[in-house]
């Protein structure tokens, strides 16, 4: 389930978490699965690389059909070069920070990125509690975005449920990703979740 504010039909998104069992303890899937999904889907593929060496896997996910690739700031590699490589392929790039990573670490990349993703849980497993303190970082970056007239989007991922929608909007968040909370709901509960997004001017859900 992905809600995005004011982005129109083009931004019906599928958020895909790629985990390597090293940077995060869990293991998911690779570019072949993304390629297989692409054959039967026209959704916007928002590919989140939770990898120790994400720069080594950019090309395979570009070839698999990603529309956006986001990479974590925490591992050591040339972040700016990796972001430029993604952009050079004609797709969108993003940079991600974990809950404990300070917002100011994003400053060198604000003019280079299409998206900033704030993890609102420690990445790797679903079902964790939303960390509200992260929203102060999102707000800080949103204020810089407005002051400098920058165009990147702000996304949050992790522990998102209906009670967080208003707080996220107030922090300047454009895109919310909800997994465990949404899929645990019955049909009526999912409709209620979607209605909350609609009433808060968030549109286009998956």
Regions from the PLM with identified roles:
Residues 15-31, 121-127:
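Glycine-rich, proline-tolerant flexible connector loops at the mouths of alpha/beta enzymes
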């Amino acid at each position: 389930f992905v809600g995005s504010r004011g982005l129109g039909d083009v931004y019906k998104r599928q958020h895909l978490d790629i985990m390597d069992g090293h940077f995060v303890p869990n293991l998911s899937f690779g570019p072949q699965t993304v390629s297989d999904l692409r054959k039967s889907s026209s959704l916007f593929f928002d590919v989140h690389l939770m990898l120790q060496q994400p720069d080594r896997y950019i090309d395979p996910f570009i070839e698999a059909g990603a529309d956006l690739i986001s990479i974590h700031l925490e591992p050591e590699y040339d972040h700016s070069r990796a972001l430029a490589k993604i952009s050079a392929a004609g797709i969108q790039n993003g940079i991600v920070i974990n809950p404990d990573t300070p917002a100011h670490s994003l400053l060198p990349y604000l003019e280079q990125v299409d998206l900033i993703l704030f993890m609102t849980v420690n990445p790797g497993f679903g079902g964790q509690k939303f960390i509200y303190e992260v929203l102060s970082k999102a707000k800080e970056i949103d204020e810089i975005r407005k002051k400098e007239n920058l165009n990147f989007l702000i996304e949050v991922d992790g522990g998102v449920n209906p009670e967080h929608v208003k707080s996220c909007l107030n922090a300047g968040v454009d895109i919310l990703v909800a997994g465990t909370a949404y899929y645990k709901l019955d049909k009526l509960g999912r409709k209620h979740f979607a209605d909350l997004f609609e009433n808060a001017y968030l549109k286009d859900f998956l």
